[in-house]
Design a protein with these regions (language model features):
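Glycine-rich flexible loops
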Residues: 6-169
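Short, low-complexity, charge-dense intrinsically disordered segments
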Residues: 1-5
């Protein structure tokens, strides 16, 4: 498939933006090495995402891949993240969502591991920006068990604590 100059430019801009956020979440220590993943919905309905085993601190725009909503690779050299099904489910259930970030920030992951949802107004900034952040049931990463645990929450929440795992926004 041949892209127009405008389409190619948009893809590269999106890839550079994902690269920038990969570096940011790495610098902020929200991920270590190959943890986490980022994706963005493209105007044609496809999804650009970080590949599997991608160190976010060294991610490059050229590393990004494009998949369809079934997870089939359309562009790129590497395989999609092993947790891409989580991203695709969110895009499917929430047409308003344009990007998904899954990370393991220490404090959020500690709450998730302790089984404590962020459902009280402890920090006003969090309440104003995200509202309540519920805790999902544990699901093994990369399996339908994980995506199934998210389904009840996706329609009503913009951030989720993943039990014993991390966070997705």
């Amino acid at each position: 498939m041949v892209l127009s100059v405008v389409e190619f430019s948009f893809l590269m801009d999106t890839a550079r933006e994902i690269e920038r956020f990969c570096h940011l979440i790495y610098q902020k220590q929200f991920v270590a090495a190959q943890d986490g993943n980022i994706s963005a919905r493209l105007p044609d309905g496809s999804v650009m995402c970080t590949p599997t085993r991608c160190n976010k601190g060294f991610a490059k725009a050229d590393d990004m891949i494009v998949i369809d909503m079934k997870g089939n690779k359309l562009r790129g050299e590497r395989k999609p993240s092993s947790e891409i099904a989580m991203h695709l489910l969110i895009y499917e259930m929430r047409p308003d969502i344009k990007a998904v970030v899954h990370a393991h920030p220490a404090h959020a992951t500690a709450y998730a591991a302790a089984g404590i949802p962020l459902n009280k107004a402890l920090i006003s900034e969090v309440v104003l920006a995200l509202g309540c952040i519920p805790l999902t049931q544990y699901g093994t990463p990369g399996t339908s068990e994980l995506t199934d645990s998210l389904k009840p929450f996706i329609p009503n929440y913009d951030a989720l604590l993943l039990a014993n795992h991390g966070v997705v926004t």
